[in-house]
Amino acid sequence: KPDSGVVSQIKVIKRLFSICEQIIVIDGFPGGDIRSLTQDDIKSIDVLKDASAGAIYGTRAAAGVILITTKSGSDTNGKVRLTYSNEFTKKQNYNAPEMLSGREYAEHNIGTDYGSDTNWWDELINKGNFSQKHHLALEMGTEKAQVYTSFFYEKNQGIALQDERQDYGGRVNASFKLFDDWLEVRPAVDYRQAARNNHYPNFQQAMRNNPTRSPYDPDSETGYNVWINESLDYNVVADAMLEDYYGLDKWFKPEVNLKLNIKPIPGLNYQQVVGYENRQWELHQYWPSTHRSEIDNSRKGHAHLAFSKTENLTSEGYFSYVKDFKGGHNLNATAGYSYFEVNGENFGMDNYNFSVDGIKYWDIGQGSYLTDGKAGMSSGKSVTERLFSFFARANYSYQDKYMLSASIRHEGSSKFAADNRWANFWSATAGWRISNEEFMKDFDWLDDLKIRFGYGVTGNNDFSATYMANMLGSDTNWMMPNGTWAYSYGKSQNVNPNLGWEEKKEWNLGVDYSFFEGRLYGKFDYYRREVDNLLFSVKVPQPPYTQGSQMQNIGSMESKGLSSVLSTARRSWARSENRTFGRAF
């Protein structure tokens, strides 16, 4: 579907009762949204998982990290480099089911014969669908200043009626070296807008519809044959065509990356990243008085408006030190802080009974349900979510044969009780590249052979921030402390003053290999994970609680398994096997 989101999976089991999502890091900006990018602006995608992910990005990396690097400017000697690409596609209706004809339906006496011959599945197909993509990039730069900017337009039509998405946007990546290379500034701005027209035609219903009925009626006002009071048979074509749906997604993301090279101490620098992301969603819907739902409910039109906004703020600052010592020793150390904050708000309104259909949702206050006190309205502000951490990590290698790394993070989350917000997490890994040993020099067919072992402890706070907020709600029956019910405004959440971090302990043993000048390569891993203090919403009695559930730390889970990947220049095979068991207490 044109409106389908991007789904990414990293093969890990992290929680028993929910799915953790991977953190997206775009050009060093954690918490990015891959849907804000176009594939032509992506330079590379890398994946981190297990201990390596937690060591760098902390608890938000519980399910792994997807690192995305976008294209940037280069030294073109001041000349402008222009690149244009396009793509045109048409989708086919594959795997269409075989439908009964009107004559076959009538012969089986399944239902009333209305005299038509309609393939309802085929009627929902947009046979004239056409999709196109255009991408224009401009690049120029010198040794000290480089700029990359791009613009794109995409129109994607699905095979279903009223299924379309149009995207356009652009981005600017720049890099400037100042003060004799003491300071490097890398600003970036990204904007994307996606307009959606999605009615999600009911193909399942199309397979149940009576094929002797026609979707069209030339004598009706709309040209469609609309009937009601038959729950198992209705005009799916009219439902899709008569509803007005317009959704608009907007992403705006400016960020600045500052790197200060401290020249009196070679190899030492300080880097500061500040980023802001604003995502807005607007939805406009209108069902006219001729729509089946309005006829069935004796209404004259239904208008719906919705708006939501999410703001992400990220700030990271860290010192890094890189030094190559005599004898093949190498050290890479980093220490700093990380801050992440999320805010959001939303609004929605429904109104009914309009004097005319043509104005649709643009004058939503004119529906009679508003003056009658029956219109639906809602608004809200999400609980502010904050994550703050201090971290340090070090990597050591000797002659690219022996490798050690260690990290520690002191992390605090606003999602937990005040006494349990801060926790310490750490990891350590070791590696041995056997292929670089002197006794392996005679094995010419061996390119790389490395054994690695790692152990790490990370936390998880992947749940709604509302569980630790004193949320209030209205228009609801509340259980009072004395055991009686009252229709009032009151607490909608049972706060747990003892809620704490979910903690994952993991060790991993793996082998990486490459043979015959890279023609055959792969890896093998054995892992074992134990998750303690699992976070789960459990049922609680009323009273003394005002609500029937509360988020608690309830138990533990253990998983272990094997995974392997074998690849050649043309083919790749992957196999995994894992066993998981849990215990609660």
Which role does the model predict for each range below?
Residues 217-220:
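A eukaryote-biased signal for short, well-structured alpha-helical docking elements
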Residues 295:
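The feature captures the catalytic groove of carbohydrate-active enzymes
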Residues 197:
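Flexible glycine/acidic-rich beta-alpha junction loops that bind and position SAM and/or redox cofactors
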Residues 213:
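Non-catalytic nucleic-acid substrate-recognition regions in nucleic-acid-modifying enzymes
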Residues 21-23, 173-179, 188-193, 201-204, ...:
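Extracellular/periplasmic, surface-exposed regions of secreted and cell-surface proteins
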Residues 1-172, 177-178, 183-186, 192:
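Short, small/polar-rich motifs associated with maturation and membrane association
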